[in-house]
């Protein structure tokens, strides 16, 4: 374990300890998401299992790469390489989701719409696209303030999201303009 990880988990000497005892919170046995059992089913396969976890001790997100290796004494041991991807995930989320409405941003929405159009052409299926804006938003902002205008936008978005299917796309095109794509 490198020093950065020791510092992040506030560990002095974790070497030789079982991972769930030092890297997880309130665990009394191997984690239910641990891939060791899968790896042990065929220890000679040399496969690596890739997965993500939100760590129970730090709350950070890790991309894990687990495999079994032959140790210097001939035993087979579990090796896990973990990369903290929390900041990358946050940056990706911030780039793709509008901070006010938590809908897709213009760029992310348009990219998904392009993919949907290509898939629709290839698979000969249709969809419905709806563009709408919020009438009188300027008057709400002028008369009651931008915080009330923001509340109006948020309420409309939250209400609409309740009626969307899992394959539908909803994104903010600009200030008060939105696109909804119904796929089902």
Task: Locate each region found by the language model.
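Short loop/turn elements at sensory-signaling interfaces that couple input to output
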Residues: 59, 64-78, 86
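Conserved long alpha-helical elements within nucleotide-processing catalytic cores of c-di-GMP signaling
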Residues: 93-96, 104-128, 135-165, 171-175, ...
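Sensory beta-strand/linker motifs that couple input domains to effectors
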Residues: 81, 130
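N-terminal capping loop/helix in small sensory signaling domains highlighted by a polar->aromatic N-x2-3-F motif
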Residues: 1-9, 105
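PAS and related sensory helical modules
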Residues: 6-24, 28-30
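PAS-associated C-terminal cap
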Residues: 83-93
């Amino acid at each position: 374990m490198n020093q950065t990880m020791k510092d992040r988990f506030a560990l002095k000497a974790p070497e030789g300890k079982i991972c769930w005892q030092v890297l997880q919170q309130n665990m009394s046995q191997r984690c239910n998401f641990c891939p060791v059992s899968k790896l042990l089913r065929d220890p000679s396969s040399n496969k690596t299992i890739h997965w993500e976890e939100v760590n129970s001790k730090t709350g950070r997100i890790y991309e894990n790469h687990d495999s079994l290796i032959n140790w210097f004494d001939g035993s087979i041991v579990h090796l896990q390489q973990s990369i903290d991807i929390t900041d990358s995930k946050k940056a990706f989320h911030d780039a793709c989701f509008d901070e006010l409405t938590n809908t897709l941003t213009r760029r992310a929405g348009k990219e998904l719409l392009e993919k949907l159009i290509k898939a629709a052409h290839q698979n000969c299926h249709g969809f419905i696209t709806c563009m709408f804006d919020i009438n009188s938003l300027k008057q709400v902002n002028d008369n009651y303030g931008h915080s009330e205008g923001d509340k109006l936008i948020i309420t409309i978005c939250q209400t609409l999201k309740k009626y969307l299917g899992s394959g539908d796309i909803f994104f903010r095109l600009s200030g008060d303009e939105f696109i909804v794509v119904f796929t089902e």
